[in-house]
Amino acid sequence: MNILRYLPGDRKCSPYLNATNHIVNWTQADNKYSKMNDLMEIEKKLKSLRKQKVEVSIRNKKAIIAEEKKNSERRVYSMADDGEDKARSNKSEPEDPIKLANYSIREYEKWEAKTQNSRHNKSVMGDFQTIAKNSYKKEVDALPKDISHPLKGGITEDGKVQVEDNPELVEKMVNDLNERSKKRYMVRKQKLDKQNKINLDDGFINDKNKRFNAKLNSEFK
């Protein structure tokens, strides 16, 4: 009978050492798999937190928009019927907060992109609004302070004040609007006439036509 003997230094032929190596490899594989599972769990938690953050941001922005819309509504009292005024007031009511929160992330991203693109336009519109406000104040200050005619009107059951319009003031407002429209038309007409004016010395309709002809001449030279 041949008896296999393994020397302590013969690591390549030792079955005990091979078994130990297999166990070590299995342990390392298990540790690696466990780490991968941990990383996947962390990634899932991060995605969930990002989604919750976007949803909370959506709810906050929609609530802010609803509050700003509610505060910016102006109530105008006129000679309109009560039914029309009530319909107008119903339109000015803020939307349901629950309805505002039920927006998808895609809609929120579109709204965010649209808001960023319109920031420059808002700043420009702010300047126009300031000019319009100053013009309106100037026109109001120019109105005659005539109180010789008694005001006609009354108070409705809802507490609204109704005042009849003064025919003279209405006529003056119409004349002012017509005069302003006429001035705008004349300014626009002068600009168009200047653009379409024919320069007899050069033989060009306008600067754009002159540049186009110069470009053609340079191409054929």
Curated annotation (Swiss-Prot):
Coiled-coil stretches noted in the UniProt entry, renumbered to this chain: 34-63
Entry's Gene Ontology cellular component terms: spliceosomal complex
Keywords: Coiled coil, mRNA processing, mRNA splicing, Nucleus, Spliceosome
GO biological-process terms attached to the record: mRNA processing; RNA splicing
Record field: compositional bias (Basic and acidic residues): 85-98
Top-rank taxon: Eukaryota
Chief location: nucleus
Compartment annotation: Nucleus
Region (Disordered): 72-98
Similarity field: Belongs to the SYF2 family.
Complexes and interactors: Associated with the spliceosome.
Known role: Involved in pre-mRNA splicing.
Protein name per Swiss-Prot or TrEMBL: Pre-mRNA-splicing factor SYF2
Source organism: Kluyveromyces lactis (strain ATCC 8585 / CBS 2359 / DSM 70799 / NBRC 1267 / NRRL Y-1140 / WM37) (Yeast)
The gene coding this protein: SYF2
